Amino acid sequence: MDLMSALSLGELALSFSRVPLFPVFDLSYFIVSIIYLKYEPGAVELSRRHPVASWLCAMLHCFGSYILADLLLGEPIIDYFSNSSSILLASGVWYLIFFCPLDLFYKCVCFLPVKLIFVAMKEVVRVRKIAVGIHHAHHHYHHGWFIMIATGWVKGSGVALLSNVEQLLRGVWKPETNEILHMSFPTKASLYGAILFTLQQTRWLPVSKASLIFVFTMFMVSCKVFLTATHSHSSPFDILEGYICPVLFGATWGGDHHHDNHGAPHGMGLGTQHSGLPAKAKEELGEGSRKKKTKKAD
């Protein structure tokens, strides 16, 4: 018996899975995606000097997952751009966030209670995209588990996976920020979600798709809203990975996460770096510091 049916939530899950995403949920997805684009250093200056490049970056933030999924499945990568309504809606959001007088629109949507609503609605879209991606890949490759997982993963986190391409459009090159090397919570969650939906699609997970969409959406909404409200870069998976990864791989997955140093107290970064140096290097560093002090004294 399906767990959701036993809890009398089957009808709720089914109704929830049938809620149309356009335009309300898609609008929220576009708003949050372009807000994160504006957070990037130099994004505002780029919009003033090179508005076309800024618009392309915004479209990549909004539709990058579709582009990457089409690329994986050998379909035209510009196919989604035939959806004129979504393109116009995303373009309108981009213009209001970057060019609205006095930044009124940006200030309104960034007001934390309002932003949390948009963040929650964005996660609804993310989970639905993962489920649709799995179904679409299953239609082409009935027994291609890895293809289904990969397609669902990029559907849920394609924007992050294309971050280096988006940086190139802004004239920035930071290979150390590769999302594969430093997975954020949405990227990891999309991967785990893609695995769950693949198991459900291939009948290895005995739950209905509507029930899985409902449960996983509630999980994503709860986690992402909490992380956004607390301005945290941590992941709910960190504790579990801390136990499993040392056993399976001999190290903690994502232990060198690029957010880890952000919370370090001021004045401890240099000492931490020095503590990781060999003894000989420490001596050379100390000798160099003494020479500099001597020169200043002279």
From Swiss-Prot:
Q: What happens when the gene is disrupted?
A: Mice are viable. Mice lacking Tmem38a and Tmem38b show a weak heartbeat at E9.5 followed by loss of cardiomyocyte viability and embryonic lethality around 10.5 dpc.
Residue ranges of the TM segments: 19-39, 52-72, 86-106, 145-165, 179-199, 210-230, 235-255
| Location of the region described as Disordered in the Swiss-Prot/TrEMBL record | 260-298
InterPro entries, alphabetized: TRIC_channel
Topology with regard to the membrane?
Multi-pass membrane protein
Instruction: List, alphabetically, the GO terms of the cellular component aspect.
Output: nuclear membrane; sarcoplasmic reticulum; sarcoplasmic reticulum membrane
Q: Which GO terms describe its biological process?
A: cellular response to caffeine; endoplasmic reticulum organization; inorganic cation transmembrane transport; potassium ion transmembrane transport; regulation of cardiac muscle contraction by regulation of the release of sequestered calcium ion; regulation of release of sequestered calcium ion into cytosol; release of sequestered calcium ion into cytosol by sarcoplasmic reticulum
Q: Please state how the activity of this protein is regulated.
A: Channel activity is activated by a change of voltage within the sarcoplasmic reticulum lumen and blocked by luminal high Ca(2+) levels.
Enumerate the Lumenal topological stretches.
1-18, 73-85, 166-178, 231-234
* Cytoplasmic side of membrane: 40-51, 107-144, 200-209, 256-298
For this UniProt record, give its keywords in alphabetical order, as a comma-separated list.
Answer: Calcium, Ion channel, Ion transport, Membrane, Metal-binding, Nucleus, Potassium, Potassium channel, Potassium transport, Sarcoplasmic reticulum, Transmembrane, Transmembrane helix, Transport
The GO molecular function terms of this record are:
calcium-activated potassium channel activity; identical protein binding; metal ion binding; potassium channel activity
Record's subcellular location? Sarcoplasmic reticulum membrane; Nucleus membrane
Residues that coordinate or bind Ca(2+): G74
The free-text tissue note of the record is: Expressed at high levels in heart and striated muscle. Also detected in brain, lung and kidney.
The residues listed in the UniProt record as binding a 1,2-diacyl-sn-glycero-3-phospho-(1D-myo-inositol-4,5-bisphosphate), with positions renumbered to this chain, are K122, R126
| Signal peptide as annotated in the record | none
Task: Give any Pfam family that matches.
Answer: TRIC
Q: Which family does it belong to?
A: Belongs to the TMEM38 family.
Q: Any idea what job this protein has?
A: Intracellular monovalent cation channel required for maintenance of rapid intracellular calcium release. Acts as a potassium counter-ion channel that functions in synchronization with calcium release from intracellular stores. Opened by a change of voltage within the sarcoplasmic reticulum lumen.
Assembly: Homotrimer; conformation seems to be controled by binding to diacylglycerol (DAG).
Family matches, as PANTHER family: TRIMERIC INTRACELLULAR CATION CHANNEL, TRIMERIC INTRACELLULAR CATION CHANNEL TYPE A
Q: What is this protein called?
A: Trimeric intracellular cation channel type A
Chain's gene name: Tmem38a
